[in-house]
Amino acid sequence: CMGCDGRSISVAEGRKYEELLNKKEGTLKCQDDLAGKIWSDRPQMSKEPVYVLNVKYAGETREDKISRVREEMKKAGAQVHVLSSLDDIVWLLNIRGNDIEYNPVVLSYVILTMDQVHFYVQEEAVPDQVREELEKAGAVLHPYFQIYEDVKKLDPSYKVMLEEQCTNYALYKNIPEGTEVIFQPNPAAVFKGNKNPVEMENLKIAHVKDSRAMSRFIYW
């Protein structure tokens, strides 16, 4: 038997370990955070305030982005999309944060259906104004860790789409048995790689500022 914290490995890694262990009649246990039980001075999760990325920088509203992702879900035949890659989440919702140093992301998860956006986040980090904007786009806020229980309640007749390289194994294992899981790249990851005119113009401005700073450094 092999044990690990399923939140710390990807679906792809977990499935690979399962395959190897099955050949040896072994099992993989992934539901316990053993280190957490003895880590008495473990730092608290970051709760930096979430802020909105204005559409003048994003070039596209969150409503339009959500609609585009839902179109990809339809093409794949999925009714549910589980999203856990932080850069894709902040792109989709037009938000930013400071939960990870040097990365403007928010510790969060998203479950996207055809009519709702379930946003799992430390709610005290979401200012009222940001909450209101997200709710206008159909988002429902939930406590960060609640996703692990909510995934268990998914209708097994639904098809669930997720990226196996970015989704953690514990989340995947909580999906009801018998549910069809569609493994494919997150549509948000593909979309955000294709910059719109507003983003391209802002990239030029950013490069000018970066070049100015580098020139000053070289001169110094």
Kindly give the residue locations of the regions a language model identified:
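Active-site neighborhoods and metal-handling regions in enzymes and metal-associated proteins
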Residues: 1-220
